[in-house]
């Protein structure tokens, strides 16, 4: 189901302690528990995750949904940024894969709640 979702909702905890959900384009997923997204180094969510790596990620497809909690790592590694670079990123990062404002967010789930075919399932990931 995650592979069918181009957009996920990523939630950070803002400076006032409130959840801050934002829609994000998914760049890559490894199974269901690891999701990669790109963003700006100067974005509020990047600031939030540097101060508190706890986050949430949700996605939805055809009436089914998955909501996960986990940790988010801000990745600045040049090789990973190059590997995950997509041509349309140039609209946001004119310097290309080496643009200093381009970073990757890596979400790693530790718990998931599924709503699949009318049934709730909670599990550790």
Regions found by a protein language model. Give the residues of each.
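A short mixed-secondary-structure module that forms the rim of ligand-binding clefts
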Residues: 27-62
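General beta-strand recognition
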Residues: 9, 34-36, 67, 113
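A short, Trp-centered hydrophobic/proline-enriched beta-strand micro-motif
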Residues: 1-15, 55-58
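Charged, gly/pro-rich active-site loop segments
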Residues: 67-125
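Hydrophobic/aromatic beta-strand elements that line small-molecule binding cavities or substrate pockets
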Residues: 24-27, 72-73
């Amino acid at each position: 189901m995650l592979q069918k979702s181009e957009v996920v909702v990523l939630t950070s905890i803002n400076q006032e302690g409130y959840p801050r959900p934002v829609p994000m384009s998914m760049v890559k997923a490894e199974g269901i528990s690891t999701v990669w997204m790109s963003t700006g180094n100067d974005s509020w969510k990047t600031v939030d995750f540097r101060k508190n790596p706890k986050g949430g990620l949700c996605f939805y497809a055809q009436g089914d949904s998955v909501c996960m909690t986990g940790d988010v790592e801000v990745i600045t590694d040049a090789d990973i940024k190059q590997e995950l670079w997509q041509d349309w990123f140039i609209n946001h990062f004119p310097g290309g894969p080496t643009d200093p404002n381009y970073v990757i967010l890596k979400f790693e789930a530790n718990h998931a709640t599924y709503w699949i075919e009318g049934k709730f399932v909670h599990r550790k990931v």
